[in-house]
Amino acid sequence: MIQMQSILEVADNSGAKKVMCIKVLGGSHHMVAKLGDVIVVSVKDAIPGGKVKKGDVYKGVIVRTKTGVVRPDGSTIKFDQNALVLLNKQDEPIGTRVFGPVTRELRAKKYVRIMSLAEEVL
């Protein structure tokens, strides 16, 4: 579960490496974000010459969490890190590649584009 001030890795090639959550979108009492939720982030660490710069504010969709997700068959998928993919104003991915695995639950949240860019779908 991701809340305000959480530090996340960036799973795409947009140029950002680490971001910090500054707002969880989705209602006034939405305090934590889970897999597939959209959050507002600030870039804390970026590579030189990338598409994004340190201090920029973007939206992002969470693709991996340490707490994981429980599927209807009872199985649980957990990851070693919290990661997200940065989105532009039109809610499309900024990067052209997604590194690492993503889960099938993104399809239910209408992020098929991220699934097609990912290396592996679990």
UniProtKB/Swiss-Prot annotation:
Family under the similarity heading: Belongs to the universal ribosomal protein uL14 family.
Gene3D superfamilies to which the protein is assigned, alphabetical: Ribosomal protein L14
Protein name, as recorded: Large ribosomal subunit protein uL14
GO CC annotations on file: cytosolic large ribosomal subunit
Pfam families, per database record: Ribosomal_L14
InterPro entries cross-referenced by the UniProt entry: Ribosomal_uL14, Ribosomal_uL14_bac-type, Ribosomal_uL14_CS, Ribosomal_uL14_sf
Record organism: Rickettsia africae (strain ESF-5)
GO biological process: translation
Subunit and partners: Part of the 50S ribosomal subunit. Forms a cluster with proteins L3 and L19. In the 70S ribosome, L14 and L19 interact and together make contacts with the 16S rRNA in bridges B5 and B8.
Sorted UniProt keywords: Ribonucleoprotein, Ribosomal protein, RNA-binding, rRNA-binding
Role this protein plays: Binds to 23S rRNA. Forms part of two intersubunit bridges in the 70S ribosome.
GO molecular function: large ribosomal subunit rRNA binding; structural constituent of ribosome
Protein encoded by which gene: rplN
